[in-house]
Swiss-Prot record:
<dbReference type="InterPro" id="IPR007900">
    <property type="entry name" value="TAF4_C"/>
</dbReference>
<feature type="domain" description="Histone-fold">
    <location>
        <begin position="164"/>
        <end position="227"/>
    </location>
</feature>
<dbReference type="GO" id="GO:0051123">
    <property type="term" value="P:RNA polymerase II preinitiation complex assembly"/>
</dbReference>
<keyword id="KW-0804">Transcription</keyword>
<dbReference type="GO" id="GO:0005669">
    <property type="term" value="C:transcription factor TFIID complex"/>
</dbReference>
<dbReference type="InterPro" id="IPR009072">
    <property type="entry name" value="Histone-fold"/>
</dbReference>
<dbReference type="GO" id="GO:0046982">
    <property type="term" value="F:protein heterodimerization activity"/>
</dbReference>
<dbReference type="Pfam" id="PF05236">
    <property type="entry name" value="TAF4"/>
</dbReference>
<comment type="similarity">
    <text>Belongs to the TAF4 family.</text>
</comment>
<feature type="coiled-coil region">
    <location>
        <begin position="202"/>
        <end position="236"/>
    </location>
</feature>
<keyword id="KW-0805">Transcription regulation</keyword>
<dbReference type="GO" id="GO:0000785">
    <property type="term" value="C:chromatin"/>
</dbReference>
<dbReference type="GO" id="GO:0005634">
    <property type="term" value="C:nucleus"/>
</dbReference>
<keyword id="KW-0539">Nucleus</keyword>
<comment type="subunit">
    <text>The 1.2 MDa TFIID complex is composed of TATA binding protein (TBP) and the 14 TBP-associated factors.</text>
</comment>
<feature type="region of interest" description="Disordered">
    <location>
        <begin position="1"/>
        <end position="76"/>
    </location>
</feature>
<dbReference type="GO" id="GO:0016251">
    <property type="term" value="F:RNA polymerase II general transcription initiation factor activity"/>
</dbReference>
Amino acid sequence: MDLNNPPSKRFGDDDDIPANKRPKNEEYPEIPGYLGNRKPSYTQNPNSGPGKLHYASPRPNNVSSSVGVASGGDRQEADQLQDALISCGIQLKEEELNLSTSFYDPSSLNTFALTTEDRSRKSDFLNSFVLMQTVSNIVNLHRLKSMDSDIHALISMAVRDYLANLLQKMIVESHHRTSQLHTDNYKQVDNVRQTLANFAYKEYESEERRRTVLNIRRAEHEARLAELNSASTNEEGSSRRRKEQSSSAAAKNISEDAQNRMTNATASIMAGSALPSGGKKYSWMATDMTPMTPAVGGGFGIRKKDSNSLKPSSRDGVLPLQQEEKGIITIRDALAVLEMDREGAGRIFGRGAKAMMRAYIRLKD
């Protein structure tokens, strides 16, 4: 290709050449942009057949093709773009409406939902015939005129929700009953049972000492009062003989209760239990007064031990946990939930009370 010489100008490249001298394609007729102020359109028209063009109505003289002041080239491009959208079958108003609304429209996606009935207020949990008959009997009993049609469905849904809550609580009670406490991280350092027994024994000893000291002080106080009373009656003489007589008379005037208290206090002091530091306790003072069980055979022999094989026991004093089967709701779980139920002002009456009594009787048996 020669780049120095410009290419020769072909026939038909110049716009100044009249249209009648241009080559025409007979298979595709020429489509003019404007023919008598009428625009061509590719949409369907009942007067035109398939594959034919029809022209829209002429534009009014007072309406411009573009808004504002625009050049002739911009107006022509806007008109050509509008013609292209119309020829493709795109409707601008519908596209604008689709863009302004949400993408998810249940009514347009699910056409079956529009044809079916509303199930939001209906429930098949209870038998509708029996429920309607029961409600009608109650309405007639109270002499009511009319009743809403949604009452039966609401009663059925309320019963379903109430029973679902009760069953959920029973399941929680069952898990709580069968669950075990994880005590692997804790170790028992001391014997708690023996420690508590020692505390109780020490407290018992301190209480006995306190009572003994109080009895001694009470007896001394009563003896002093008796001495003062006897000294006031015998004012004459200060000899030794009169003093001995006054002391013997004072001892005789002491009541029997005071004498018994003084005797017990003296015995306690002699035994050593009344001292603050304690004293020696003999075996005959610590023995229990309960009678011994007779030997086997009625004579001297080996004592028969009590059979405690049925009772669970442990060396450290802690009872072992009972192994129960999991995943079962027992009568105890149901009764615990019903007792803690606060429906109906926290009271159980009517058939509910009868059901509770039957459950308790069955549990007792």
